[in-house]
Amino acid sequence: MVTTRCLCVILTLWMVSSRPSASILPGAPSFGAWWGTPESRKIARQADNARRTGDLASAETYYRQGYDDAVHRHDERAMVGYLNGIAACQITQLRYSAALVTLLEAKSHAKAIGDRADLGAIAVNLSNVYLQVRDLDAARKVLEDGRAALSSLRRPYFMPNLLIQLGRSHDIQQDGMARSFYRQGIDAAREFGDRQLEALGLDLLGEERLGQGDLNEAAKVIEEGMHLRERFSPKDLDLSWWRMGDLKSRQGDWEEAARYTDLALNAKGAAPEYRLKHQRGMIRMAMGDRAGALADLREAVQLSSRWRLEVLPASSSLTAANEMLDGFVFSSFIEAAASEALRTGNQRWAAEAFEAVELNRAASLRESRSLADAWHKRVPAEYWDTLARLRRADVEALAKHAPNDESRRLRLELAEMEAKAGLGFLTKNSENFYDQTSLIHFQQGLRTTEVVLSFYLGDRESYLWAVTRDTLKLQKIAAAEKIRGEVGGFEDAVQAGRPEAVELGERLYQELFGQLGQEAVAKPSWLLSLEGILFEAPFAALVTEQKGGKVSYLVSKHSVQTIPGALLLSTRPDAGIGRFLGVGDPIYNAADPRWGEQKKPASFLNLFHTPTTAGTAQTGQYGRLVGSSEELKTSAANWGSQSTILLEGAAARRDMFVGELANGPSIVHLATHVIYPLGKQQGYIAFGLGPEGRSEFLTTTDVASLRVPGAFVAMTGCGTGTGDPRPGAGLIGFTRAWQMAGASAVLATSWPVRDSRGDIFASFYNHLRNASPAEALRLSQIDMLDSGTWRAVPSYWAPYQITGGAR
């Protein structure tokens, strides 16, 4: 049985609103003042009583009354306490977005009065919110704040909670340190007399032990936690029954596993229902109850989709949440439903499995794109200042070849501002989205020339759905590991120009598409919904057949477009021959004669070069892109717009480019270097030297914050189409960032391409005047294939790809 550890575990932190004043470090201002009026004491008692009976709505109402009273008395310390009580209610009800805003307000007040103890507690609460949605970077940063507060205080009241939170963080990282932190937190909770927290710590340690395969210790600590709850907090027993159900499943005792899981479900307590439904579905599947299992797993998907509406509306949290949901809830249902469809021929399960694949895949980008509009309207002015500071911090990180603490801190600040700006927007739009995802609605939007080919890669077997306007066909293909090997070998052979690329391409084509029905094969427009290693496959160079010594490539028959998800398809706006904005041939080095003799400070790009001896002058690592100037000119000429802006040489500056975007170009063409010194997810578009002699750049974070509504974007630099493939979220990189910025489609490269005059782009823009981007790329690739020159080889034309939902 597949389970995921440390997800959506309720760590309710009531500590700020009910802590004794004796917990304050000697010398700090007395905290007892906020209980100092009869009204405040009455409110606190009412809130605690409501909380203990599980009436969280009433508890939150009482805490809000207390907060209003504290505001009236100008008592910031009391305001902090009540805000944390409100946040705890919100966290327990899985209202993470609201909890974030409440906690950030509490943090602001705590900073104003210099209360380190409150700040430490708030850091623990914030980490809880971030861990719930798997935003690990944000959680680590606020936990570091909590540890800093812990080191400056003597036995602060939040110490047990902090230690357990650190255990959760290390558990998710699986770095071997979780067990020690859990044990410390459990011991501290016992010393503080907090039996509820002690039981929760035992639960989490039990989950960690289950994940390590230590069933004996897991059983011991989970049962210990259950006995504690039986004695001190029986209303929380559903949390123990949930874990006991998981434990019994691991032990193969399916009857007991089902009994405990049913107990937890019937209790309707704090254990998340979608996790329990998923757990029972897997138990029923193991017991041979296919119908019951499918019903439970299907409901788990529906419940988790509603849970997603409460995820923090910041791009990092949305990506993490989709990745987490894909990892167990969606995958379990998809595999069960697809298997049932193939076993019985029941089209209902084939269709529902397809919808589940595409719902989770599309949600992350769609929600992030929607939020991008909200951010621009609602983020404070300091957001852009913070973004600029992050850019400077990234410069330092690049110079050191490693991320730095300042970058992490600033990214957290941006995420918090994004989340606050998106509140009230995500839920409304997401609810509309989920109401519109029926298969009929989707299929009616397809053209008669199109087929959507949607892949799901599984450990045991994978699946391919071929969906046209009238049909949906499901087929089983090889497991992910086999496909990974075949794609890797094929890509390497094509890139290197080796002759075995033909045989490997034909084999991979048969593996992926050999079972396609005639209707799908006949469709000229292929829309690919991908995951994992498939993002790296040069589909255009797949070999459909060899006959009489002649090789037929897929590109000869089909245009290929990678889509962010089948549920995100749209029609490309018809803007005519609109404005063309191009950037190319920047000045990358002070040695460039165009820079001028009077300006010779070191280039930023030189920072990547380490001199062999002290005092040796650094030389640039990146050469001039001489051919990019011709590429820009021929591309613009073949597009034929009456409004063309080409930023070359000294004009190829970041600020000039961003300024021109405000004029709404239809085409954005970037013929620049693109570098990935710190990993595929965060890249840098390198512009020319600025006034200080340092190169300027745009990161993927910067790009996602731009606005290019409806524009077509071409990035012809090295490997611009690469990124970090994330389950349930897609490829995280420049192509996704431009789509978040509003681009209708993006042309990018899978590997470095030889610098030339841009012949393929001259052909591409000529065809784009009368064709879709995917078809224009196909025709230009055929032009290269038939050219009889060195450009005819797949290693030249195959790495170009079109990504986007508009067609």
Name each model feature, range by range.
Residues 143, 222, 489, 532-534, ...:
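A domain-level signal for caspase-like cysteine endopeptidase catalytic cores
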Residues 41-52, 78-92, 117-132, 157-171, ...:
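Conserved alpha-helical positions within TPR/SEL1-like repeat arrays
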Residues 59, 65-66, 99-106, 139-146, ...:
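Tetratricopeptide repeat
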Residues 54, 94, 134, 173-174, ...:
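Residue-level detector of the short coil/turn that links helix A to helix B
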Residues 756-807:
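An often Trp-containing, charged/polar helix-loop segment at the C-terminal end
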Residues 290-553, 568-605:
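Amphipathic alpha-helical protein-protein interaction segments
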Residues 666-763:
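Catalytic cores of nucleophile-dependent amide-cleaving enzymes
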